Amino acid sequence: MSLEVVARHFDALGSTCELQVVAGSQAALERCEQQVRLAEARFTRFVRDSELSQLNASHGRYTPVSPQMFSMLEAAVWAYQESGGLVNAAVLPALMAAGYDRPFIEGLSQPASVVAVQPAPLVEVLALDRPTRSAAVAPGVALDLGGIAKGFLADQLIDELGDNAVCNLGGDLRLRGGGPEGDGWHIGLCDRSAVALTDGGVATSGVTRRRWGQGMHHLIDPRTGLPARTDLLEVSVVTDCALRGEVYAKCAVLLGAVGGAAFLEARGVHYAMLPAEASRAA
């Protein structure tokens, strides 16, 4: 017998989000949605007085930050190191140069000229001081946390949702429990296959969701400072948490089908790829 699933859908973080809980309450889901919205207000680069914007404007001075921001910045450093520099939060100037200078929903336009802006190595331009819970961003550098925010938050919120739940933030999700049928939550991957999981994370990254102009998209290759040129449209990764999946999926897209497969297989994770030729054959 299937158990009742309580669900809540909402738009946040530039994406569609879905929370599902077996035998849960709408009140609990509403509280989690509110936490997502508060985090979005903290991490956005599109609001001048957000915590991230203030940090970006600190001109190299150490600035006290909230506990959640400090944890997010630590996650950004981990992502940079784990990815060998492919996931680099110091990518904001490159995004701006590519035309991603406002929320995507407001419409983006092709820049008059596309200028490559290679991001500085994050570990050289972001300093963290744990005793004072403060951070410093080097002058001339600006961070964008959108590349890891959804996975980071999904991992945080799963504890709020309980022992049988899914937190899906724009395709980056964390889950636990047997689902309504008891055999795990059934999660679709980018190649239309599916997996049944009772604990872990699934994340999908690609170049199909935020596109504008001619060949412009939001996934910057830090090796070139330009929107990535890749033979993959999307990659889904199944691993122990949403943040790791998000980082690994981005790496695979940036590395392309051959390099991405080698990267993921070396880490022993399940994955699915959607090659660019799949769109032409459809």
List the predicted regions and their residue ranges.
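Mature catalytic core of soluble alpha/beta enzymes
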Residues: 1-282
